[in-house]
Amino acid sequence: MNDRITIEGRDGEFSAYIARPKVLPAPAVLVLHEVFGVNTDIRGHCDELAEQGFIAVAPDLFWRQEPGVDLSVTSEPDWQHGLRLNQAYDRDAGARDVKDTANVVAKLPGCIGKVAVLGYCLGGLMTFLTAARYGVDAAVVYHGGDTEKYLGEVDGLHAPMLMHLAEEDEFISKAAQAEIKKALTSKPNATVYSYPGQRHAFSRHNGTHYNAAAAALANGRTSEFLHQQLR
């Protein structure tokens, strides 16, 4: 069942999309969006996770700036709109929002209390920051933009983390990827996978650079990881 819920955070209320599995109780996964908001792709990822047996929740990270953002990945004006939102986005406040969402979701009827965080691009960075600052049960990062700027916080990572990097990512340079990999080698609970020949958002269904084989590999690894960590 798919629906909307309201998250009461420390800084205010905001909405979230929720997809529930057929069988409850179940663990939960927060799905953190890219610069396009809680759009068709993000809702689709939630629906797929629900089919795999998870309660999937996608909070509206842009609620302070523009509640209800739902942009198209194929529209140039929407791209520019999303990039402007991203530039003005308060990442510190955003990490608090994610943690508040996790706290609320852990107590939802039908949730066993375990909550992982999974994010794409901006959402990937917010997954990293939330895990480092507040702790989560598990974390999955898909091509988290600007992660290299926050590697000084890596010591705060204690939860199991899975990270997916596209080797030809036009938004995360090879040098930045090398920095990320080096920093995470000190964390035995972190696993980084690189995908040769892949560009940014290769796992996004409607993305320009979508690659079905690479997406299936990454998503299969994610599914296995989540089932292992949230049992």
Language model features with spans:
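N-terminal cap/leader regions of alpha/beta-hydrolase-fold enzymes
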Residues: 1-231
